[in-house]
Amino acid sequence: TETIPAVFRLLTNKEVALPPFSATSTLPSLMNGGKDFSPWSKKDDLLYNTIRGPVMAVLGRDGVGLPDCALAESKFEKGENISGRMLTIISRMSELRNNGTPDMEFAVSGLLARSQLAGGRGEDARRTVLALREQFEERGLTRFFPNMDAMLCRIDLHTGQLDRADEWYRAKAPRDPIHLNVMKRYQYFTQAMVEIADGQPDAALMTLSPLGPYIKTCGRYIDGIHLHILTALALHRSKAEGWQTHLTEALDTAAEFRFIRTVSVYGTAVLPLLEKLEWSKDAKWKNQLMADVRAQAAYYPLFLQPRLPPGEELTPTERQILYLLCADKSNAEIARIMDSKLPTVKTHVS
């Protein structure tokens, strides 16, 4: 909290000049962009109120919209409803576009898309990203496309558009575990998700493995949560030991920062593992987490689930029952909601 005001004074007195930089590294995130700001999120309100002005003054164009977006993303990761915050930020998009940077535009649109996805509005999330992609294409900002396309792939995985996800995997996934490029880590994680969804857990483990040392050395807490959850999923799918250790590591880190959506975004994929795991370090946080995980599972019951063989796709009735099961409804409750007989529901569930 003392560094930013000090730099502000130096800049004001023209004693130092800042070189250009990217707060996001072309990622759709400020909290987990060029730097991991998880430690800051523990005091997000205090920091916002005390250094918002100096940050914007110090960073110039790079600071336009940054404090508000960073605070909103911190609250989002903690499971809060950020609809009101997003309305305020979106109302200033013209100012951001004219006076800020495309990095911040992507961070804001990325956060909007993630909040839409978390609210069960997957198609809205896809439209948000596609709209920005079209604008960036007109402005020649193609450097954002690799991570933007990876984000679209993640949305496709949530909404069951597996053919589109596979198309991204074939044409755009890095698929080179030997030569790690940490700037592509968002794409590596997306690649691992597709591999898990396609029933290739061993390939996912190969994709994820090189990221471990970098994430640990550089203190990438959010990336670490994703790494451990995806590793746990891949190990569990391959019926290997050790998934409990990785999931415990992810929960320990998430609980430290009070993060909810970093874990709950995996919804129906991680739900059975969470129900099996004995973890009781913070009951209140765990209850909040499980509620959000079940909500995501209900919105996207096929996320990262093995692809069904041709001819075995779920019927609309089966999809509705799966949706309600993920919402933690009992067979009797499902029967009442669907105006069906209990034995009929039990037949579908079995």
Name every feature range the model reports, one short phrase each:
Residues 4-12, 243-259, 294:
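TPR/TPR-like (Sel1-like) alpha-helical repeat modules
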Residues 75-77, 116, 156, 195, ...:
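Residue at a conserved register position within TPR or TPR-like alpha-solenoid repeats
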Residues 280-310:
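Intrinsically disordered or compositionally simple regulatory linkers and C-terminal tails
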